[in-house]
Every structure is written in C-alpha cells, then in structure tokens.
Amino acid sequence: MKKKIFTSAKLLLMGVILSYYLVFTACSALTLEFEERDLTITNLDGKIIPIRVELARSIREMSKGYMGRENIPEGTGMLFIFKRDEKLSFWMKDTPTPLSIAFINSSGEIRETRDMTPFSHQSVDSSEPVRYALEVPQGWFEK
C-alpha cells in the first residue's frame, strides 16, 4: 500500500513539474525580446532617414516577428538578418498591423518594397536573392 502511494506521489510531482515547464515555455515565447539598433536609410534624394529597428536573427525571432503586435510606432521597424543571400518569403499570419517590407541586398541597397495585408496567409516573396528584409508600418517607405 505504501509503495502505491509513493508511486502516485511521484507521478503527481512529475505532472506538476511538467505543467510548470509548459507554462514557463509558453510564457517565454510570448515575451520574446528583440535587440534594438539605430539605423539610417539614405533615400534617392540623398536625405538620411533614421529608424530604430528590432533585430530578428534567430529562427525563433524570425518566426515571431510582429505577430500579435497591434501598435508599431512610426520610425521603427524590424530587420530580418539572414546568413546568406536567398529568395525570401514572408506572410502576415497573426499580424494585425498593415506592414510594408523592403528586400535589401548584401550591399545594403533596397531592391524592392511591397505592402502586406494583416492576417494574410499569402506569401510575399522577394523577386531576387537578398540578405535582409525590413518590415515597417505600411506606407513608411513612401514618406
């Protein structure tokens, strides 16, 4: 009888530990913090435009992106940094804010910009291999 109670207590303790682990992992995914940097973009007229960006380097950071964010302040963005030039593909799953994306080559030159629709599962692809992608509030590149 004592052995059965001991085994049940061990199982209960393992269940409690597993529950705490699952809750902690879920919460840490929600509270992912991105490193921030100040960058500048030089437009075609030679005007220098400052922007504060969050850096997305890891798969986890890239997967999270702006998902769930309802407010992205003007003058800010998220810079996705890839290890090599490749054709990139983005979507807006669980992203409620309209965004524009710039596809940027390894020399830092913006090759193209595209607008993206909130919550869309349709992919937005770069037309050529690039190293970076910069997401900003929709319309920011036109200003």
What are these regions (language model features)?
Residues 29-143:
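Compact, glycine-rich, soluble single-domain proteins
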Residues 25-26:
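C-terminal motif of bacterial Sec signal peptides marking the signal peptidase cleavage site
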Residues 13-22:
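Hydrophobic helical h-region of N-terminal Sec-dependent signal peptides
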Residues 2-13:
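Bacterial N-terminal signal peptides that target proteins for export
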Residues 4-6, 19, 46-47, 51:
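Short secondary-structure boundary segments
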